Amino acid sequence: MRKKVIRCSLNPKSIEKAMREIEEYKREIIRKTELLRQRVAERISETASQGFGSAVVDDLLRGGARSASVDVSIDTRGNVSVVIAKGEDAVWIEFGAGVYHNGSAGSSPHPKGGELGMTIGGYGKGYGKRNVWGFYEDGELVLTHGTPAAMPMYNAMKTVCAEVVDIAREVFK
């Protein structure tokens, strides 16, 4: 969007015309700002979806790795858009589970993990403090090394923060 120059003379018609131009310019800025918000949210959603799609949710001792089941969506209310990762695997993929892949118990490979209380071995009964633990699924004992922290939401934010100037230039051109 180019710099807008509005000229007017000191007479009622010219001032009214200038005021209409200002209102039109204001509407255009609001429209483009909404478009920027939408484009940024879409880019975060797209990038996070790719991260969740390629993540391992369980590193099983038998049967290999299991893929995640996470849906990423955008919720827009008024002038706020929120990117949401929904699914029982989302938190494990974002923050990791178990010391085998993620470092010592009580730490977090995720830059926000400690701040948010998402530390390794800190959830539930603390089985993630072990290299291997099990859970029952369909009556069968399943042994796992846990989940490597893939951080798809965090990484999507970092990626889009690096791209936001280019996105804004494209929207406001």
Descriptions of predicted regions:
Residues 1-90, 102-173:
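Short, Lys/Arg-rich flexible segments
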Residues 94:
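His/Glu-rich zincin catalytic helix
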